[in-house]
Regions:
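Helix-turn-helix
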Residues: 19-53
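Amphipathic alpha-helical packing segments from all-alpha helical-bundle domains
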Residues: 86, 105-129, 133-144
Length: 146
């Protein structure tokens, strides 16, 4: 990727996180974000559709990062205590970013996104469990217990 594009993207992200740490998502304007990031509005729109797309992209990146750092995701069904600890450690590693991105109206999104990613991970490895209600309940319980 072109380094200029990556620097611009990082500038947008940094400005967004700074604004988001002080404001609700719904109160952040593209104009204010662009001023803080020192970019034109057209530059923002070249990267993201709107402020919600930016927020969703960052939220998804956090969830993917948490899931990628699980050392033994296959143990979710075999050793739920171990898996819960690993998941909790993933949350701790991203604690400040989670606190910013998933605050206010976005607070329920973290659990929903993690649950979807966790089920995708498990059902990708064990497709035979996709329709198993007990496994679905257990995965939800593990997540909400963490």
């Amino acid at each position: 990727m072109d380094i200029r594009i990556e620097k611009t993207r990082q500038s947008i992200i940094n400005a967004f996180i700074e604004l988001r740490s002080h404001k609700e998502l719904e109160r952040i304007t593209i104009k204010e974000l662009c001023e803080k990031a020192q970019i034109n509005k057209s530059t923002f729109y070249a990267h993201y559709q709107d402020i919600y797309h930016l927020s969703d992209t960052l939220e998804t990146e956090v969830v993917v990062s948490i899931m990628e750092n699980l050392t033994h995701p296959e143990r979710v069904l075999d050793d739920t205590a171990f898996f819960s600890r690993e998941l909790f450690m993933g949350f701790l590693a991203k604690d400040s970013l989670i606190g910013i991105l998933f605050s206010g109206s976005r607070s329920k999104c973290l659990v929903q996104k993690i649950e979807a990613a966790l089920k995708e991970l498990v059902f990708g490895a064990y497709p035979q469990y996709r329709d198993d209600k007990d496994i679905n309940i257990m995965l939800t319980y593990i997540l909400y217990g963490c």
